[in-house]
Amino acid sequence: MAAVSVDPQRPLPVLLVSVSLGIYEDEHHRVWIAVNVETSHSSHGNRIETCVTVHLQHMTTLPQEPTPQQPINNNSLPTMWRLESRNTYTGTDGTYWRLLDHSQMGDTVQLTLDIIIGEDD
């Protein structure tokens, strides 16, 4: 399991609520944009796993126009995430998302979450 990078000077958002496709607002009215959504698939015997990783960045203002960095398809993302523990968020769809990174570089605060969904063949 990968180590979680957490910036202790910036608290994790407790709630992230979708205000538009790929745009979330936390409990302090800070805006977070899903700048990248990665999906990968792997098989283990009769089991197929899908891993979805989402990279969210804190923005001080909403973009007026979609940027090239914004993902085209956010259908796999819940409409709300709630922080359940130090490294786990629960989606409104009942999914559990693992916190991979919470860090800041310059003015950019990043939050990276992932989920692994297993299905039997």
UniProtKB/Swiss-Prot annotation:
Pfam families in alphabetical order: TCL1_MTCP1
Gene3D superfamilies: TCL1/MTCP1 (2.40.15.10)
Molecular function in Gene Ontology: protein serine/threonine kinase activator activity
Highest rank taxon of the organism: Eukaryota
Family (UniProt): Belongs to the TCL1 family.
Name under which the protein is recorded: Protein TCL1B5
Species assigned in the record: Mus musculus (Mouse)
